[in-house]
Amino acid sequence: MRLCVNKLSALALLRHVRVSGEYASAQVCGLPEPDPHPQHRWTARIIPHQLLGLSDPPSSSRPVYVAVPSKGARPLASFFKNTLYLSGLPEGSFLQLGESLAIPCPELLFVELATIMKPAALGLLGYELCGSFCRDPLNPRSGKVTHGLSPVTDVASIRSFIEETHRLTGTNAARRALLSIEDNAWSAMEATIALLLKKPVTEHGYGIRRIHLNERQDNPWELVRRGCANARVPDIVLDDCPVGFNYDGHGHLDLESVAAAAENKDELGRALASLRQKYVDDRRRDRELAAQGRIVMSVVSEDLFDHGGLDIVILEALMASERLGGPRAKDVLPDEVWAPEETRARQRLIWSLLPWEGGESLGPC
């Protein structure tokens, strides 16, 4: 079998091969013509549906998205949705994954999904492709997130790809989405906060464009020679303000390990020691960053779920920045950010982005 899947099918396959490590062996290829060989025709049973994000074999209501190089090459089974590419793509726009399946390169995939995804979901996808985390192929909304992976692209590469295309549907939406995306996100929740910071106020974000993620902050030698870390890496820093943010999720301090070890004295001691070590390192990190002139605010999941919770954290950070000699809070964010109808709309957007069933209104992610 030979098939180039695209759009949501390709996204699921890309997530699978990122987690498995198979993406490292992907090879640039041309756009192949679909071929069911050694079968004589396309049937649902020969499609590796779980690799393509489907829990059941494909059907007309659960299609496989396919890219083809000509009208005559279109597979006509009812469970396929075809995209025709005759021209307009740069060289190297497709990747071969093993013998049977190919996908669009990450840059083309991002543009394709701009035709399907809502802007906020597309923004989160951009953080995923340009970051070191990957969502679950079958359950991207609330499934397991894998961390510590290599990014498959970056913002500059996507922007360059868009500029090289000709009359490709989705480029305008993709170009707009890139304005709210940064490289090097380490987690999905960190990416959510960064997206909200950068999205324009007209799209219910905070409109803070100049931020960086996971950028090394070197400690002064006076601290290093006394045993402090060489550097610290806050999740998010604001370029124009002496503040930043760290997301501390439920797994940050592993309280569950303490509960699990409660009946075994030795295991409990080790779990408590590990928890204490993490807590102490966090406090030292905060002090060392403060010594560099940067206050880093912790963001917890409750701040995102509580109505107006993230608004409070952002306002606290800007008030601290102002007192540290940064710009006035009202010069960073316009008054309309805090209008009641705007805060309600922003909270609805935040809820739609979070990993819970209530966020499904955002559509595919």
State where each predicted segment sits.
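Short gly/ser-rich loop at a beta-strand->alpha-helix junction or flexible surface loop bordering the NTP-binding
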Residues: 1-169, 328-365
